[in-house]
């Protein structure tokens, strides 16, 4: 049986690995000239690590990762609004780790047969019968996995009437800085702006920020980050001072409205192509890894793609909704609303977070 994977990101490589382990002949088509990722930091929650274990990649990924430390939410002045009970989270759900996105991709790419990886190939169309049109010609497969991101060519080809990605209302910046002492990990919430930082395994710091802006507004790079956040609490000014202007990544944030199905004929969608979500729960990559495991399971069991759709669509769309709601509250800009939000966070027990995360993290391969 032959499978073509459209897209060589996390969803694509994980799907290729899952299918290869089930005996499929796999080909991954990636439009970039090489299978690499500039990217930044990435959180892998316990559900993702269970998925990686099921793919046989858990150990090499954890060898390149660092366990998530104490964390919480602050205001722009540095006052704690809430702290995560990471000990209880780990006891209840398992370990969470931080890794550089490029390191995760490297592990996945190494685990897939190298002859299966075809870079520099741009897919221009996909048909439900398993035909893939691309810059190198035309290919046919028993299964096509559209893992080509939020603006998926696969989705637009097979589901031309599917809803377009929806702008979340805020934009994002990401940058990895040289090592800077940061103490506890935190995400700080202001008025329509947020800034977070997390140590990576090599001592560098992954920083991310969001701000309410019109869709398509210029990002402004490091200068804009400094303008917005240089007056926030330590160590944010030091992190911005240490950042390389050329390393700042800027992207508007989108989510995909719920699709009626993730499958059609011999085609299945995975990752952001199926359920692009805002990053507020840190679940985008985690859900892509779950997709891959389930895809491998249902094809091995001979249950057909309907079982994949049944197992994945409701769960991923639930997580997309939860992530949207968290982001909406985090991006509140009205002074009265921000005061109310911050007061509520201070009063909320850490056990409430554990309960809220249970439907997301309680997943078994």
Describe these PLM feature segments.
Residues 1-4:
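Extreme N-terminal starter segment of soluble prokaryotic enzymes
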Residues 8-33, 145-146, 173, 245-334:
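Conserved mid-domain beta->alpha element of the FAD-binding
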Residues 20, 45-159, 163-176, 214-226, ...:
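Conserved N-terminal helical subregion
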Residues 24, 57, 234:
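Short phosphate-binding/catalytic loops that engage adenosine nucleotides
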Residues 32-34, 41, 65:
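Residues in the short beta-alpha loop(s) of Rossmann-like NAD(P)-binding domains
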Residues 82-105, 137-139, 178-249:
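Conserved FAD/dinucleotide-binding core of flavoprotein oxidoreductases
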Residues 152, 172-174, 193-196, 274-275:
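Histidine-centered metal-chelating micro-motifs
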Residues 346-365:
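C-terminal auxiliary extensions adjacent to catalytic cores
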